[in-house]
């Protein structure tokens, strides 16, 4: 008998639910939501697609194409949310301001939001956007888990060094409430660790599978 993380089966059944340009268009505020956030080109869409074994989130060579809150249903009461990519230079300033306004409204109002997965490019961590998200998580006591993405772009030693460095910086500035790991979509590095976080936040217990 082995123990299988039930979030794996749910993620494999993930399907697109709806897109929302503003909070009023979001699904009913009930159940469990986990939001995926990240600066443009941090590998957010690739991470989502890897965790769901599907091409749910749009990937593009032009970062910042995700302009809406995109909801993906795992079951009747659990959802993943792809938040707008933020910070790409080619996006007009008024559009950036629009994104930020509705991103802040979503983060500040959703009672069903159980945690935020924040993507950081392991080669360029702790941007101003990342720190803004960490500040918000601390102020609102929202659980946050960081994926240091694109870990395959660094050697094992360099990736570990970056992980330890970012862990230390976060601990000093934001306390012990933030967890962090290395992640690579192409290599599927760190996928099981990410699943465990999702299962915990969505209150799914490991179940024995015969």
From Swiss-Prot:
GO terms for molecular function: GTP binding; metal ion binding. PROSITE patterns: G_ENGB. Its cofactor is Mg(2+). GO terms for cellular component: cytosol. GTP binds at residues 38-45, 64-68, 82-85, 149-152, 182-185. Mg(2+) binds at residues 45, 66. Gene3D superfamilies: P-loop containing nucleotide triphosphate hydrolases. GO terms for biological process: division septum assembly. Residues 30-204 form the EngB-type G domain. Transmembrane segments: none annotated. NCBIfam families: GTPase_YsxC. Belongs to the TRAFAC class TrmE-Era-EngA-EngB-Septin-like GTPase superfamily. EngB GTPase family. HAMAP family: GTPase_EngB. This is Probable GTP-binding protein EngB. It comes from Pseudomonas putida (strain ATCC 700007 / DSM 6899 / JCM 31910 / BCRC 17059 / LMG 24140 / F1). The lineage of its organism: Bacteria, Pseudomonadati, Pseudomonadota, Gammaproteobacteria, Pseudomonadales.
